[in-house]
Amino acid sequence: MATKVLDSWALIAFFEDEPAAGEVEKILQRAADDKHKLLLSVVNWGEIYYNTMREVSPEAAEQKARDLAALPIDIVGVGDDLALARQAAIFKATHKMSYADCFAAALAKLKNAELLTGDPEFKALEKAIKIAWLK
């Protein structure tokens, strides 16, 4: 079973019914049908939470957390071995990207997985990781 990593961009597009929402919905359905495994870094989970809290309300952020928990996505923590944090730090030191995006990219690299995003910030990493561009 192939493993894919979601960036917060993909999930925000899904929740906000942006143009890529249908594509993300199909990806989520394939994961629910055990066609592939979906991963999300806990840092990107936090990015979705704080953006919702900041832009809408604390209650909306809690609802979004419940909505995320209901999706067929495994949340990956940073853990004690520091490999994920180290790779994210390397990406941050060598590319002009947000630190949260560096965690999504690092997770994709460490899991040899495809990153699903539409965020142009990841163009700098096209040679370092596999990226599926959502539109």
Task: Show where each model-derived region lies.
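Short glycine/serine- and small hydrophobic-enriched flexible loop segments
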Residues: 50-53, 109-110
